[in-house]
């Protein structure tokens, strides 16, 4: 009997993520090396999650529903079902003097934690630093190639 993935199932999948035609993340070591995004300290293995629990972005979880073990497909996920649209309210200009006690000099492109929240410095002037608190993939269309490796059906009630 073929088990098609449904909400509540525990699945393991391999994936390749492309943004703007460039591979930026994968669970497959060989693909990471080919695309020069390999990190030796990372474990490259299928990711496991319960479908519908909100552990991953909505579009990814929806994409695996109806798939079966061994199946591979490529899906394009719009920002609304990915990391959301960019929100201009999440861009904030703060006085540069707030960095006076920091152990670094703020520079454009730098990623920092501001009150525990990740932000990217997008502009530095003599008096101000502009921070962008949007997720780096906000507003981006995500192209995922997904291959199902394992499915554990949800426990029937």
UniProtKB/Swiss-Prot annotation:
Say yes or no: keyword Isomerase present.
Answer: yes
Instruction: Report the record's Gene Ontology biological process terms.
Output: protein refolding
Query: What is one term from the GO cellular component aspect held by the record?
Result: cytosol
Q: Which residues are listed as membrane-spanning?
A: none
As its record notes, the protein acts as a catalyst of: [protein]-peptidylproline (omega=180) = [protein]-peptidylproline (omega=0)
The reply to whether Chaperone figures as a keyword in the UniProt entry is yes
Give all residue intervals belonging to the PPIase FKBP-type domain: 1-95
Subcellular location as annotated: Cytoplasm
The record's EC number reads: 5.2.1.8
- Record-annotated disulphide pairs: none
Return the similarity comment: Belongs to the FKBP-type PPIase family.
In the record's own words, the domains note is: Contains an N-terminal PPIase domain and an IF (Insert in the Flap) domain.
Function of the protein: Catalyzes the cis-trans isomerization of peptidyl prolyl bonds and accelerates protein folding. Also exhibits chaperone-like activity.
| Protein's UniProt name | Short-type peptidyl-prolyl cis-trans isomerase
